[in-house]
């Protein structure tokens, strides 16, 4: 779409997702067997025919860079690009100080493209959005800034920017992560929260960021500084995410922040519902990613041990012998020896699990080897001595671990 530039913030450290983010940036964390978190934001742009995109990186970005190079290379296509921009440190030897500062330090790239509008989106949420519809709303309202929003239970709203709107969709109030969130009028159990997705008029964006950069009292963040300063002027509008319609999708609106171990695990379990809210199978909204050249998943019975797979996703290159897999997601090249039982678990790929293992409610990162007969997830006190265990009882085994040897 002409006149539009996409900028995806992909520099998140993801401290609440450790140990999954010990060796990679948050947007590079695998999801759903075949994808990385960054893929869902990129698909929202590409499926909306928005093909001029900068991806801004910062922490531990090598695996993200490799994934992008293999799966999202548009080189040779005139006026279409998906380019990774690592932290440049052009404005002093410092990391990005906030989301607004990340864009400010890369304004020169915006000026090179000279767009009319700039779409600034995060990269660590699971959802589908036709961004063209949000753009149409932004232009129709003649807004300087449009923020996408959705309803959230009031008990969870303090984790987000909380919004107030008038009957015309204009923002009339905003608080970033308030301790006592305001509810939607007439709906005391619900709040309207920011999704962290913004569409700016390019001239407005440049002006606001330059002013913010000169303010020594600012934290240089869109939610904490830019939006509170802009909305009283009356040109900030709120786009209702529930009005975004995608062919082949359900009416219900699925959006998940997967910033914690519990939410990451739960979002995987959502994929395994009988009729999931978030579908991987909509041909009208294909989910592009890098798919390595692998054979199909293979299932082999071993004597009296039969393969039994129920409510699970098994990715290419996997080899499963005589084991039971229940309500689990297995990434590329998962190798499961005979007699094992895996339940409600997420295996990120390139994992070898020995014979006779029992694994329950676990997340197993890449390149892990587990010895025969190992039991994980039944005795959490014992597991805490060896692994990371979340407050909700999800066992996480770090990348490259050797367990039981």
Swiss-Prot record:
Lineage: superkingdom: Bacteria
CDD domains in alphabetical order: ADP_Glucose_PP, LbH_G1P_AT_C
EC number: 2.7.7.27
InterPro entries named in the record: ADP-Glc_PPase (IPR011831), ADP_Glu_pyroP_CS (IPR005836), GlgC_bac (IPR023049), GlmU/GlgC-like_hexapep (IPR056818), NTP_transferase_dom (IPR005835), Nucleotide-diphossugar_trans (IPR029044), Trimer_LpxA-like_sf (IPR011004)
Database matches in SUPFAM superfamilies: Nucleotide-diphospho-sugar transferases (SSF53448), Trimeric LpxA-like enzymes (SSF51161)
GO biological processes: glycogen biosynthetic process
Pfam families recorded: Hexapep_GlmU, NTP_transferase
Gene Ontology MF terms in the entry: ATP binding; glucose-1-phosphate adenylyltransferase activity
Catalyses which reaction(s): alpha-D-glucose 1-phosphate + ATP + H(+) = ADP-alpha-D-glucose + diphosphate
Function: Involved in the biosynthesis of ADP-glucose, a building block required for the elongation reactions to produce glycogen. Catalyzes the reaction between ATP and alpha-D-glucose 1-phosphate (G1P) to produce pyrophosphate and ADP-Glc.
NCBIfam families: glgC, PRK00725.1, PRK00844.1
Subunit structure: Homotetramer.
Protein name: Glucose-1-phosphate adenylyltransferase 1
Gene: glgC1
């Amino acid at each position: 779409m002409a006149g539009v530039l996409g900028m995806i913030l992909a520099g998140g450290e993801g401290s609440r997702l450790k140990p999954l983010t010990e060796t990679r940036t948050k947007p590079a964390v695998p999801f759903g067997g075949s994808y990385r978190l960054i893929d869902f934001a990129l698909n929202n742009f590409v499926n909306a025919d928005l093909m001029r995109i900068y991806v801004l990186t910062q922490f531990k970005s090598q695996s993200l860079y490799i994934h992008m190079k293999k799966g999202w290379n548009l080189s040779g296509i005139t006026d279409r690009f998906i380019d990774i921009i690592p932290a440049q440190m052009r404005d002093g030897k410092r990391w990005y100080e906030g989301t607004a500062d990340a864009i400010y330090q890369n304004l020169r790239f915006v000026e090179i493209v000279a767009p009319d509008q700039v779409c600034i989106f995060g990269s660590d949420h699971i959802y589908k959005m036709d961004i063209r519809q949000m753009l149409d709303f932004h232009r129709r309202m003649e807004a300087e800034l449009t923020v996408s929003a959705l309803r959230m239970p009031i008990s969870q709203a303090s984790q987000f920017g909380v919004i107030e709107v008038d009957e015309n969709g204009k923002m009339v109030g905003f608080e970033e992560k308030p301790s006592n969130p305001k509810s939607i009028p007439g709906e005391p159990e619900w709040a309207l929260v920011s999704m962290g997705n913004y569409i700016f008029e390019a001239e407005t964006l440049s002006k606001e960021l330059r002013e913010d950069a000169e303010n020594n009292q600012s934290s240089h963040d869109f939610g904490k500084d830019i939006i509170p300063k802009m909305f009283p002027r009356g040109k900030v509008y709120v786009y209702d995410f529930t009005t975004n319609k995608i062919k082949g999708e359900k009416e219900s609106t699925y959006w998940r922040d997967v910033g914690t171990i519990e939410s990451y695990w739960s979002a995987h379990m959502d994929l395994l519902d009988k009729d999931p809210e978030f579908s991987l199978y909509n041909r009208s909204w294909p989910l592009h990613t890098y798919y390595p050249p692998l054979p199909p998943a293979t299932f082999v019975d071993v004597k009296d041990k039969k393969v039994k797979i129920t409510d699970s996703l098994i990715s290419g290159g996997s080899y499963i012998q005589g084991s039971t897999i229940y309500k689990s997601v297995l990434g590329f090249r998962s190798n499961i020896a005979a007699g094992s039982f895996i339940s409600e678990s997420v295996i990120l790929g390139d994992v070898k699990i020995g014979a006779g293992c029992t694994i329950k409610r676990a997340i197993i990162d890449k390149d892990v080897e587990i010895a025969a007969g190992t039991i994980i997830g039944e005795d959490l006190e014992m597991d805490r001595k060896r692994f990371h265990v979340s407050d909700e009882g999800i066992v996480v085994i770090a990348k490259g671990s050797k367990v039981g040897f």
